[in-house]
Amino acid sequence: MRRTAFLLLTLALLTVPVCAVQIPGELLDALPEEAAALAESEGITEGGVQLLVQSFFDALRSSLDRSLRGAVLLALTVLLTGAADGFASSLGENASRFVPLVGVLCVTTLSAGDLSSLIGLGTATMQDLADLTKLLLPTMAAALAGCGGVFTASAWQVGTLFAADALTTLIHELLLPLVYCHIALASAGAALPESGLDKLADGLKKLISWLLCGAVTAFTLYLSVSGVLTGSADRAAVKAAQTAVSGAVPVVGSILAESAEMVLSAAHSLRAAIGAAGVLGVLLACLAPLVRLGVQFLLYRAAAFVSAVSGVKPLERLLEQLGDAFALVLGMTAACAVLLLAALLVSISMVVM
């Protein structure tokens, strides 16, 4: 009788309110409004897909409305420069020498606004992703620790935050200034075709690409290795703890071990909910800037094709290299988004056996 009463009393003490699937308010405040609303509902997957598709088409429509006017002006400038170059050729070599220079100055002037606004947009998006990383990763680490992944939570959070901050610093302090240097060299090389500055701009573009690819590869390898090593340590620690509790605590040891399994299951649900909300928030935060940068890159490629048809080689090279600048910023923004998504997916996949 005493054992039964003791068992019932112990079970009553273990009956406590559990809110393991409630997403922290700080994370909801950091997410876009649409993602925060979906995060509190049950159909986050279906609603998230619909929201992403709708946001994509809205961003595409808005980007075309903003960029088509500038692309048409660039195409008209290129065609007028080609016509003026053909007319100046009949007047002599001295007259035809300055026509491409005027065209380069016009294209550079027309592109200055796009370059400033879109590179600024990419920079702001990367900063928003960095801020979201500083809030989202500690939240995921706390949920991961609740799953029993104490070693994983500490190592993963500190290491991933450090790696993400290093990548953001590399982009802001080194790669973006190099992109501006690439643009300046491309413009100077188009104005002075025989100087070889355009080749230097191409070399600088390759250097930026190599640095970005190297940083992304290092971050990806870190996520892979840290997930494997720390996850193995956590699984061994949790199994040892369950065995110790089951054998050391009299009467209710096995019950406590089973309740630990239930707590871990609830923590897994929390981590999955936070991960889904975080993935949706990251995608919504970077979708519109990526679409706009991609549209701008394609329009500059189209303008370069028009320039090739018109026969003005310096303008063709300049427009191609300006398109490359948009592609570089697009790659940097996409790298930040993809690596944050990879960190979230690695965390979600760290299941304690």
Question: In which residue ranges do the predicted regions lie?
Answer:
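Loop-centered beta-sheet repeat module
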Residues: 160-221
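Interfacial loop-to-transmembrane junctions
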Residues: 204, 310-331
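Gly/Ser-rich, low-complexity
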Residues: 1-100, 113-133, 148-161, 165, ...
